[in-house]
Amino acid sequence: MATTAIVGGTGLVGSNIVNILLSSPNVAHIDFLARRPPSTPVTKDLIESHPSKFASYISTDPPSSWASHLRSTSPAPEIFFSTLATTRATAGSLAAQRALEHDANVDLARAAKEAGTKVYVLVSSAGADPSSKLPYMKLKGDIEKSILDLNFEKTIILRPGFLSGQREERRIIEGMVGVIGNAAGWLSKPWLKDWWSNDAVEVARASVSAGLAALKGTEPDGQQKVRILAGKDIVRLGRTERKEAS
């Protein structure tokens, strides 16, 4: 069974990843690093049902400072999940957003590798590109490049579109696009919504499924060192390959 760690586990996708990991018989341990403990009733119930499986490190210090805990955690995480992200409005500036999203992600990824992590799973964004003129897409692309430079045994990058689902911290733009995406799917075909909007639970299922497959060496296309999932790949894994995540 796999040992895991996650940062960003209180967010929309991250909280669903935590729930899936807690429910999975293929996962032995979850190290949860966050500013606050899980707060959803579903997660709390799952933790109560699997108390020996879950360990939390709660700190209000900057996430980059959590690296020392990660290096010494036991058991060492074989799979590391990162959904760590924020908005410029929440961070206060583009520089502050970069410090959290890029610098903290890279510092924690480096610490995970030093601790013995074999598989790194990053939830990024559609359009991520280090050469993009759009600050957000460039930021996401820079994160991906820096993670790839760390040269994990296996790296999985998911690039979902706008995320739909119930989040604690409502983001206005994502909410509007999610409504439009849902309407498009209802009025036309489900694949139309899937083209630009991804359900957070499906992204979480795809993340866990791909991570476990990479650790086992059962990826569909063989032993892939880097696997990038977007659009239909996320939908396929999230909807039809649940066995890997359960």
Swiss-Prot record:
Membrane topology: Peripheral membrane protein
GO biological process: import into nucleus
Claim: Membrane is one of the keywords in the record: yes
GO cellular component: mitochondrial outer membrane
Chief site of localization: mitochondrion
Localisation: Mitochondrion outer membrane
Keywords attached to this entry: Membrane, Mitochondrion, Mitochondrion outer membrane, Transit peptide
Keyword Mitochondrion: yes
Transit peptide: 1-37
Superkingdom: Eukaryota
Family listed: Belongs to the FMP52 family.
PANTHER family, per the entry: OXIDOREDUCTASE HTATIP2
Record protein name field: Protein FMP52, mitochondrial
